């Protein structure tokens, strides 16, 4: 297919994987990233955690743990939170088709795909190696560009000898007032 639209989360720069990993690390007595998928799939129900960043959702999780919520229902809530955030902050008012193709390493966890299906009612397609699809797409686009324009060439030394030119600090500028520091 051909990309016809693109959008990023305008409130938070954390990706799904880093969001889940950070929360599992913060609540390591309760969650384990390696088992988070199976924990969520074993749940009888999920709870609503909202669409907060990991800083604010931690408070919600602490209150839920204190009130006796099971780790299984909280795991479902984590996955659902990711998708609610996506639907409200990235998809926004855009229409989606009947099938959703999901890529990125977090989609190697079936529970995340289940959350997408549950919240959208769409058929979900997950490739065998969801974490490599973005790199594959980028390489195919680069190949097409090089094939179509013979004046371009790929200097392999530039590929293997990459230096990071800059690293800067930033403040989160989410609408809910996160103002937490980060590094990019």
Task: For the regions a language model picked out, list residue spans one by one.
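Adenine-nucleotide phosphate-binding core of ATP-dependent small-molecule kinases
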Residues: 57-88
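Short beta-alpha connecting loops at secondary-structure transitions
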Residues: 3-10, 97-98, 119-127, 170-173
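Oxyanion-binding/catalytic loops of NTP- or PPi-dependent enzymes
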Residues: 1-9, 14-18, 113-115, 124-125, ...
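Acidic-glycine-rich active-site phosphate/pyrophosphate-binding loop
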Residues: 1, 52-59, 106-121
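Glycine-rich phosphate-binding loops at beta-strand->alpha-helix junctions
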Residues: 90-119, 129-134
